[in-house]
């Protein structure tokens, strides 16, 4: 396990995420959509690995839907502390664990279900993240990612460029964090190369793709 960073740019958003999760079960509507999609495949009795888990709302929700156990990793130590707190509040702390770690460099434990919610867009290069997460995945692999194709993909790239100017101007807060728009088709091809078949592929909130695979 890697040493905990002193501070992560995501720390500033943790309190808002927790507030929303306490009210609605999950911090974001997209997370709820991914949880519903995974529930549709079947979470009962399965183990789950949530990479870039944030405050753990997806993994905790999976336990509520019947998953046997779950584990989450995130770069933000504040988010991990919040995830542990929420798991305790929801009465599932004995079946879930959260650790600070980078999924692109950490040795990941195997799990039946591996999920990456709004994670690929935080990495300049997703090859290592794909390699490690796919190696850990048993029967289900799922992710959400910004659209990269067509007019929406162009819009996303423009929006990301504007956001990255803001992040650079606030380097003291965000460090080297940037938003990246990756080729969704290339990621889909990489996942299929590991023997997964696409079960669900849909657009959410206009600019996001949600994908669930099984093998």
Protein language model regions, located:
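Conserved class I S-adenosyl-L-methionine
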Residues: 1-42
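Conserved SAM-binding loop of SAM-dependent methyltransferases across substrates and taxa
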Residues: 55-66
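Conserved SAM/SAH-binding beta-strand->alpha-helix loop
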Residues: 76
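Conserved SAM-binding loop
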Residues: 83-84
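A short SAM/SAH-binding and catalytic strip from SAM-dependent methyltransferases
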Residues: 113-125
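A short glycine-rich, Lys/Arg-flanked "PGG" loop and its adjoining helix->strand segment in the class I
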Residues: 128-139
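Conserved beta-strand signature within the Rossmann-like core of class I S-adenosyl-L-methionine
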Residues: 138-146
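C-terminal alpha-helical "lid/dimerization" subdomain adjacent to the S-adenosyl-L-methionine
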Residues: 146-190
């Amino acid at each position: 396990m890697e040493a905990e960073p002193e501070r992560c740019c995501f720390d500033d958003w943790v309190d808002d995420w927790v507030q929303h999760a306490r009210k609605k079960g999950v911090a974001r509507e997209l997370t709820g959509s991914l949880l519903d999609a995974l529930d549709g495949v079947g979470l009962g009795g399965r183990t789950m690995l949530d990479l870039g888990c944030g405050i753990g709302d997806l993994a905790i929700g999976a336990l509520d839907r019947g998953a046997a156990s779950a584990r989450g990793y995130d770069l933000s130590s504040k988010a991990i502390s919040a995830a542990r707190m929420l798991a305790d509040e929801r009465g599932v702390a004995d079946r879930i664990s959260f650790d600070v770690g980078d999924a692109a460099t950490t040795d990941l434990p195997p799990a039946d279900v591996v999920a990456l919610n709004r994670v690929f867009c935080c990495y300049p290069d997703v090859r290592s993240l794909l390699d490690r997460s796919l190696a850990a995945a048993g029967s289900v692999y799922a992710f959400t990612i910004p659209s990269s194709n067509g007019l929406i993909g162009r819009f996303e790239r423009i929006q990301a460029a504007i956001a990255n100017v803001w992040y650079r101007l606030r380097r003291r807060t965000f460090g080297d964090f940037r938003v990246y728009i990756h080729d969704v088709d290339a990621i889909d091809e990489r996942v299929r190369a590991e023997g997964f078949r696409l079960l669900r592929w849909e657009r959410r909130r206009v600019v996001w793709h949600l994908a669930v695979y099984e093998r």
